[in-house]
Curated annotation (Swiss-Prot):
Belongs to the mago nashi family. This is Protein mago nashi homolog 2. One of its GO terms (biological process) is mRNA transport. It comes from the Eukaryota. The modification N-acetylalanine is found at A2. GO terms for cellular component: catalytic step 2 spliceosome; exon-exon junction complex; nucleus; U2-type catalytic step 1 spliceosome; U2-type precatalytic spliceosome. The lineage of its organism: Eukaryota, Metazoa, Chordata, Craniata, Vertebrata. The keyword Acetylation applies. Component of the pre-catalytic, catalytic and post-catalytic spliceosome complexes. Heterodimer with RBM8A. Core component of the mRNA splicing-dependent exon junction complex (EJC); the core complex contains CASC3, EIF4A3, MAGOH or MAGOHB, and RBM8A. Pfam families: Mago_nashi (PF02792). Coiled coil: none annotated. The keyword Acetylation applies. It comes from Bos taurus (Bovine). Required for pre-mRNA splicing as component of the spliceosome. Plays a redundant role with MAGOH in the exon junction complex and in the nonsense-mediated decay (NMD) pathway.
Length: 148
């Protein structure tokens, strides 16, 4: 496994539409800082920004999820480019590897299966689902707990 200082992850998904720039973004920094932002202007909603530090065991689990996904073996050259529907970006530094992916928003597995690289895009799709689930859980748990 890579050292903590050799790890960084950032994910962004968003679009510019009738409600302005709406997006979800999160990043894990080498020191364990999790930064989360969710901006929706729907019904005049406000931007949600949260920051928290996660334990090194969470960082190790994050690295394991990425390693298990084998995303570092993929290439986004044949993936759908960002369009008016939106864009997704995933940047990962793990050890001496630095990878970055950009594609359009993916609505469902139908979009994945109809792409020019369904196998590679499927890896990305499921990894992003796992990462979002982890981040939503961490943010939800961290900010719902009331100290005694």
């Amino acid at each position: 496994m890579a050292m903590a200082s050799d790890f960084y992850l950032r994910y962004y998904v968003g679009h510019k539409g009738k409600f302005g720039h709406e997006f979800l973004e999160f990043e894990f920094r080498p020191d364990g800082k999790l930064r989360y932002a969710n901006n929706s202007n729907y019904k005049n909603d406000v931007m949600i920004r949260k920051e928290a530090y996660v334990h090194k065991s969470v960082m190790e689990e994050l690295k394991r999820i990425i390693d298990d996904s084998e995303i570092t073996k993929e290439d986004d050259a044949l993936w759908p480019p960002p369009d008016r529907v939106g864009r997704q970006e995933l940047e990962i530094v793990i050890g001496d590897e630095h990878i970055s992916f950009t594609t359009s928003k993916i609505g469902s597995l139908i979009d994945v299966n109809q792409s020019k690289d369904p196998e590679g895009l499927r890896v990305f799709y499921y990894l992003v689902q796992d990462l979002k689930c982890l981040v939503f859980s961490l943010i939800g748990l961290h900010f719902k707990i009331k100290p005694i």
